[in-house]
């Protein structure tokens, strides 16, 4: 009999399901500090809750579930150059092959404004594979996650590969979370 992983979204979660995220908090403060409205691109798998969070903060959001296109040879974002002040990459890079991940990073760099920010989460730390996870915003300092049933497990992405993917960014910060995922914050030059 198959075991189903429990869902912790919206319930009293064990400590590992809800956690404080210093890099997400920094992403939020950087977005709020931008002049004018900073449109955001939310690369899924996202949730209505995440989109609603940004709309309440008065930031227009375009949501695009790149995972629907994960088998495509070409990864492209159908948006104008410099269209977004910030991009959220919810585990998408750890589900793409290395070549597709590099293509997506070039596309993200193209659609981000100068001094724009990318917040990305990688499932697992390159050694441990957590399986596919869905992350949701609680507030500007906290996130929570749950397993995604039926989604193939992400490939292991080593820290060296993460550093290479984020090389074009002016500033990059990487944190390994206690539950095993990695968060990355990159800022455009």
Residue ranges, per PLM feature:
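Short, conserved clusters of charged catalytic residues that mark active-site
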Residues: 45, 91, 103, 157
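A short glycine-rich, Lys/Arg-flanked "PGG" loop and its adjoining helix->strand segment in the class I
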Residues: 102-114
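Class I (Rossmann-like) S-adenosyl-L-methionine-dependent methyltransferase catalytic domain
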Residues: 1-40, 46-76, 117-189
